[in-house]
């Protein structure tokens, strides 16, 4: 029963709220006396008061909502008006922009027509002429810049190259001895020559047959000569003959025994020389066959220069230059040390020693850059790597410096003498000095005989005669010095 009463009360309150909303929305309801209002059936006094309070609260909430809606509607109306004004303003600006663009196009066209009438050129022709002018100017500026860069690069390259080569030469100092292609064996007396020849020449024939070396016995006192194109065979024969002379027993069987022992001794010396060379250069891990061939070069000479010493010197020079250029020196030194390895077999295999050496290095597992440095050091193959170029440079420095080879030293001295002879033959020349290893010729002339103009003529004539008569690397600078001195004494 209480639940039913509560439900009826809620329904009554809801109906009352709806009625109040309708009255507020559509008009005021006629005033009703409090006495005319009947309480819902079954609703007590307290319940009616509570319902009345709820109705008042609902009415207040509705009024607040209506006020907020009205304020929002007012704001929306104001925003709409503002947007409409902005749209009208944008339309006016667009219209003004269109007029300005049209005026600008008209002015540009009038300017173009005026320029064409003034210059006598169409717009396309003027544009092409301007582009050509700018292009030519840019090319000229670029050419000047390139020329300046090339000049600076050339000067820097020459300076750096001279510095590198000079540093390498200064840091490498090696002794060179000019060796002959003929070995001399000294004898305790001339009677030993007869024992070497033997009865009916059997000893000398056996010696030459076993060793492959020509034994020359002439009128030279207490000495015999050994001649052979193979320096290793000649060295073996020299050691064998010295042992035979010391022993005193000389006959074909003894010659054969001593030759075999001498051959083993020379092979040990070659092996030791090769190992010393590798140790001096700082190279390891080389194939034993290459080491053996390298040792054979201990007894080979080229223009009087020992080949093994030349290889060690070349390796040091190449290593120093590689270090200056921040390149791995080990690879460069390896190629430089082996660049003449083909000379150990050049008479046994057809081909040049550079190509033979390259094939040997390739066969025994050397790096391809090392192989290329060997085959390209005489330009039989075009150098493609910096290692090959450094090997060429080091080889030229080692073999080309004065004193390294007899033939180059003789030609060097002859060239200097000829330079001085050419300059001394001119009238009025007092002194001549060949300086800087023959790269500069300084000529002192008599000031009373030669004037300034004649000095220039003499310098030009000497230079032309040198070009005609001499062959020389690089260039030779001819400087004619004419000096006049006047002196007085104050008493």
UniProtKB/Swiss-Prot annotation:
Organism: Acidothermus cellulolyticus (strain ATCC 43068 / DSM 8971 / 11B)
Function: Endoribonuclease that initiates mRNA decay.
UniProt domain KH: residue ranges: 181-247
Gene of this entry: rny
GO-annotated biological processes: mRNA catabolic process
Record's subcellular location: Cell membrane
NCBIfam families per record: HDIG (TIGR00277), RNase_Y (TIGR03319)
Membrane spanning stretches: 4-24
SUPFAM superfamilies: Eukaryotic type KH-domain (KH-domain type I) (SSF54791), HD-domain/PDEase-like (SSF109604)
Any one cellular-component term (Gene Ontology): plasma membrane
Name of the protein in its database record: Ribonuclease Y
